[in-house]
């Protein structure tokens, strides 16, 4: 596709530092990271959303009041609560991120410097999710994700940031239009961009909500889904 003059971007909920190394080995032209909180093109950061410092430090007390566990996601570190009983998915995330090549991938909420762009929350039957939304909705948008049974799972993103917004930034930077964009997705956090672009492609193994909100469904990822869709649209 690149040989035919097309730019290829990764549009991910992850911040750049925690993008899988296997992804970074490919010569992508750019990245939309952290649900639109950072836009990178040809190795340079074109846009980055900086969260207010007081806001970042105010979140811990709200999370504790609402009995919600979270992971703050930064470009160089992720921050974890110090708790005797972390939810199982939190432990799994920490163990996975600890293996990255970053200098200090794991930090904690009591760190004097909180450098993060977005965060994820996990809830159980004791959590007060509605109260959390009420306390934070002025500053954040919420993306309901597939449950990590028995835990609820949401991404919390600075208000106005999204995967769709990241696409808009790139389109404007390149002087292109949304009509020239082709978007691939398989998860509920892809819906903002899949419903934003006309040429939206769901992988065949996508969640039902995704399959119902795209213009084209390709084969599953393990059955050359991306290649087949690129051929279908004449991009290769």
Feature-to-residue mapping (PLM):
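Hydrophobic/aromatic beta-strand patches that form the interior of the parallel beta-sheet core
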Residues: 9, 32, 182-184, 201, ...
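Asp-based, Mg2+/Mn2+-dependent phosphohydrolase catalytic module
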Residues: 196, 200, 204-236
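Short beta-strand/loop segments at the ligand-binding rim of alpha/beta enzyme cores
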Residues: 5-9, 174-181, 198-199
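Conserved acidic, metal-coordinating active-site core of Asp-based
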Residues: 62, 68-69, 73-184, 188, ...
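Active-site phosphate-binding/coordination module
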Residues: 2-89
């Amino acid at each position: 596709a690149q040989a035919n003059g097309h730019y290829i971007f990764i549009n991910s909920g992850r911040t750049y530092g925690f993008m899988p190394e296997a992804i970074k080995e490919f010569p992508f032209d750019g990245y939309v990271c952290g649900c639109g909180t950072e836009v990178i093109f040809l190795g340079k950061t074109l846009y980055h959303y900086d969260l207010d410092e007081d806001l970042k430090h105010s979140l811990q007390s709200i999370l504790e009041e609402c009995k919600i566990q979270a992971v703050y996601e930064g470009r160089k570190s992720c921050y974890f609560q110090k708790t005797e009983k972390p939810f199982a998915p939190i432990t799994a995330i920490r163990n996975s991120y600890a293996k990255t090549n970053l200098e200090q991938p794991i930090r904690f909420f009591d760190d004097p410097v909180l450098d993060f762009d977005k965060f994820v929350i996990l809830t159980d039957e004791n959590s007060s999710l509605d109260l959390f939304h009420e306390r934070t909705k002025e500053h954040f948008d919420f993306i309901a994700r597939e449950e990590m049974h028995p835990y609820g799972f949401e991404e919390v993103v600075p208000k106005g940031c999204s995967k769709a917004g990241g696409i808009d930034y790139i389109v404007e930077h390149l002087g292109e239009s949304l009509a020239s964009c082709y978007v691939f997705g398989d998860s509920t956090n892809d819906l903002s961009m899949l419903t934003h672009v006309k040429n939206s492609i769901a992988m065949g193994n996508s969640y039902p909500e995704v399959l119902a909100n795209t213009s084209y469904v390709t084969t599953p990822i393990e059955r050359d889904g991306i290649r087949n869709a690129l051929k279908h649209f004449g991009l290769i």
